[in-house]
């Protein structure tokens, strides 16, 4: 078995995690740092990767997340929100694929995702692009907020995965009632 131990600071916040699996000790999370409002602003994992988080001072929403390994940037996400805090977009501006010494598998890369919502704040449209792949997704809802359709199209050089789902309910006047 494995025993995971949470270590806390004086404020009761997790500051590190360790593991003991079959007698072998390891560090899962070496350090977690917080700001005065209790937001996580820094994490260092057991593998040495470090992440910093920046928040909007007025609305306390995550604005930016930066991930580094061996001092080199791996990911730099920037987040956008609407007036009611729905996330409108995530952009990663770092392309770590050129860093062959720390990214032998050539994972990650620049990406851009956008989201749209209806007047009830339900996700109705999403688009994104990363590497050589892109996707679109659209959803519709009924009067009781039940999903009616979901159409997703994925296009990449390696594969294309598309689907079109139509949801049907036995009792249209009570679509969310148990049957």
Task: List where the protein language model places each region.
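Acidic/glycine-rich beta-solenoid
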Residues: 1-179
């Amino acid at each position: 078995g494995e025993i995971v131990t949470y270590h806390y600071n004086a404020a009761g916040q997790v500051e590190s995690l360790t593991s003991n699996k079959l007698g072998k000790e390891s560090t899962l999370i070496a350090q977690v740092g917080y700001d005065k409002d209790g937001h996580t602003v820094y994490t260092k994992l057991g593998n040495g990767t470090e992440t910093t988080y920046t928040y909007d001072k007025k609305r306390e929403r995550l604005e930016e997340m930066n991930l580094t390994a061996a001092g080199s940037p791996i990911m730099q996400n920037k987040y956008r929100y609407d007036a009611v805090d729905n996330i409108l977009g995530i952009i990663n501006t770092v392309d770590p694929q050129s860093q062959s010494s720390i990214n032998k598998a050539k994972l990650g890369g620049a990406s851009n995702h956008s989201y749209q919502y209806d007047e009830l704040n339900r996700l109705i449209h999403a688009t994104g692009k990363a590497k050589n792949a892109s996707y679109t997704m659209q959803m519709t809802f009924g009067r009781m907020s039940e999903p009616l359709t979901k159409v997703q199209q994925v296009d990449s050089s390696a594969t294309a995965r598309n689907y079109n789902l139509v949801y049907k309910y036995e009792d249209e006047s009570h679509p969310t009632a148990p049957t």
